[in-house]
């Protein structure tokens, strides 16, 4: 009885095709999330994002604010009608606040 023989090129093609099929596709594209600052509050106050996503704070209030999370991000002053953006790079739950108005708080859950 004859045994089938596969040449090396065909075997290599099968291995490469199998490896590519197991990748699961490219990672999802980053998303831009917007947090509005209005009436002395962050909206939404709780945001869930993925590593690599961007968050933009838009100051729709009449006074300046910040979005500050020590060790994670710091917008400095965001003037009225201005915006500030950052990309998140590490997973975790990040609490942030406005340094000018400490009662203004928010949380970013980074997955």
Label each region the model flagged.
Residues 2-11:
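Bacterial N-terminal signal peptides that target proteins for export
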Residues 2-3, 17-111:
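Extracytoplasmic copper-binding redox domains, predominantly the cupredoxin/blue-copper superfamily
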